[in-house]
Amino acid sequence: MTDKTPLTESGELEYGVAFNGELHYDFEMGLSTMAQTYQALDATEAACGTTEGAKADLYYRMALMVFTLRRLGTIPPEALTPELLLDELTAEDYDRLLDATIAVKKKRQRTKNAAPDSGSPSSPSDTTA
């Protein structure tokens, strides 16, 4: 994988998001970055007047999903808004999107190397036989 390869995770929602008389299930989630977190906080403050409290927290979560989603069915990107997700997304489908964000992060995570093999015997008696 090169730096230019986008990290994504695809999946399907269980209940879907209704838009223009159609239910949309297929999604592709990208890597959530600090820039998207910043954008989501800005959107939350603009919509709620604050970033504190339960309502603002829920709006922030939907805004972050909007900025992280690469695709949700055939919904045009400009129509994918926190308000749409608040109106249409079920808690179960939110969990699926959240699981996808975790899966994308795991793809980016450094793999843990196994302990190096020193090539030396494990005990002194192994050398005498």
Locations of the language-model features?
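Short, surface-exposed, charged amphipathic helix/loop patches that serve as local interaction elements
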Residues: 2-129
